[in-house]
């Protein structure tokens, strides 16, 4: 039995004399492997168990310290070379084991990253970050509205609150620098902002949430409907400039989409912004301002922030 304690091996001679080390114990074998992996961390502790041995209780524990191109080793127990499998197999198995460990560590880190992505969507981003497009828009200035039947260009539209609603057709976008809509008042008293996740629809209640999916590239986004329109032929929805960028059809101007009304998310959204539905038609007619208690200031989540939170809940992008 060869026992070596607190013995220093230079990395270069170790590589040069690898044949000599083949005849020694697992101690020197492990040193040889460590020498080939000189970029490992400065302190490593390994236990070579039965995975490398043919006999029961065949193990040895080593502590390696790398300092000034030296490897210092302290062996607690060393066994005879004949109790080991071939050196080549040890090297291959050891390196394979290290590779497996590295893969496991990578997977653990990756799962940790994924776990962080699966955290509550309200915790993934700060309210400040989600509110960057409308930081001062903490109270909804519009009001809840379904509205009466109306007529545009000879066609009658009947606003209503459906239990289930989907529609397929063409979408356009508005809010460009030349169309003059940016900053204008919407059909329910809100203020249009081309940088927010909003849309216009002919008959859905205002405000409500809809999921818009671009049929060309399958990209989706959830928007707040706060205006009426569009009234051009074959157009079923107008989205903001920001929404068009997320859906990737800003340059084309028009794209085929599928829209889906989200009644449950709409109810939750209205509660989040403390917007109450009017209880009777007379009250709704006379009440032009929003019906809500002001949002608590300490959470600092803007109206657009709340819309983004719903998108994040469904793992949808909130930026182009």
UniProtKB/Swiss-Prot annotation:
Q: Which domain of life is it from?
A: Bacteria
* Pfam families with a match to the protein in the record: DPBB_1
Key words, A-Z: Cell wall biogenesis/degradation, Lyase
SUPFAM superfamilies attached to this UniProt entry:
Barwin-like endoglucanases
MF terms from GO for this chain are: lytic endotransglycosylase activity
The EC number of this protein is 4.2.2.-
Give all cystine bridges in this chain. Answer: none
Q: Which Gene3D superfamilies has this protein been placed in?
A: RlpA-like domain
Q: Does the record carry Lyase as a key word? A: yes
| Function per UniProt | Lytic transglycosylase with a strong preference for naked glycan strands that lack stem peptides.
Q: Which family does it belong to?
A: Belongs to the RlpA family.
Q: What is this protein called?
A: Endolytic peptidoglycan transglycosylase RlpA
Tell me what organism the protein belongs to: Rickettsia prowazekii (strain Madrid E)
Lineage of source species: Bacteria, Pseudomonadati, Pseudomonadota, Alphaproteobacteria, Rickettsiales
Which gene is annotated as encoding this protein in its UniProt record?
rlpA
């Amino acid at each position: 039995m060869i026992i070596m304690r607190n013995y220093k091996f230079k990395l270069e001679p170790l590589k040069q004399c690898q044949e000599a080390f083949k005849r020694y114990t697992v101690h020197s074998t492990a040193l040889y492997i460590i020498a080939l992996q000189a970029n490992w961390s400065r302190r490593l502790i390994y236990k070579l168990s039965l995975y490398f041995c043919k006999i029961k209780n065949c193990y040895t524990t080593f502590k390696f310290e790398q300092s000034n191109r030296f490897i210092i080793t302290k062996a607690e127990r060393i066994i005879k070379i004949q109790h080991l499998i071939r050196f080549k197999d040890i090297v291959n198995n050891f390196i394979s084991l290290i590779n497996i460990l590295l893969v496991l560590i990578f997977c653990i880190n990756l799962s940790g990253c994924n776990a962080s992505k699966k955290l509550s969507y309200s915790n993934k981003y700060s309210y400040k970050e989600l509110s960057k497009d409308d930081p001062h828009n903490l109270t909804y200035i519009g009001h809840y509205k379904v509205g009466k039947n109306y007529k545009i260009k000879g066609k009658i539209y009947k606003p209503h609150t459906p239990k289930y609603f989907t529609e397929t057709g063409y979408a356009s976008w508005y809010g460009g620098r030349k169309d003059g809509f940016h900053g204008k008042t919407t059909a329910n008293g809100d203020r249009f902002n081309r940088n927010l996740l909003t849309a216009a629809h002919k008959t859905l209640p205002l405000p409500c949430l809809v999921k818009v999916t671009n049929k060309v590239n399958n990209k989706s986004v959830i928007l707040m409907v706060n205006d009426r329109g569009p009234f051009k032929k074959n157009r079923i929805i107008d989205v903001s400039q920001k929404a068009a960028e997320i859906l990737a059809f800003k340059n084309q101007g028009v794209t085929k989409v599928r829209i889906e009304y989200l009644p449950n998310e709409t109810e939750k959204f209205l509660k989040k912004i403390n917007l109450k539905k009017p209880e009777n038609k007379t009250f709704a007619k006379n009440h032009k301002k929003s019906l809500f208690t002001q949002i608590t200031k300490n959470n600092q989540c803007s109206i657009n922030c709340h819309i983004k939170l719903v998108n994040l809940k469904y793992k949808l992008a909130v930026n182009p």
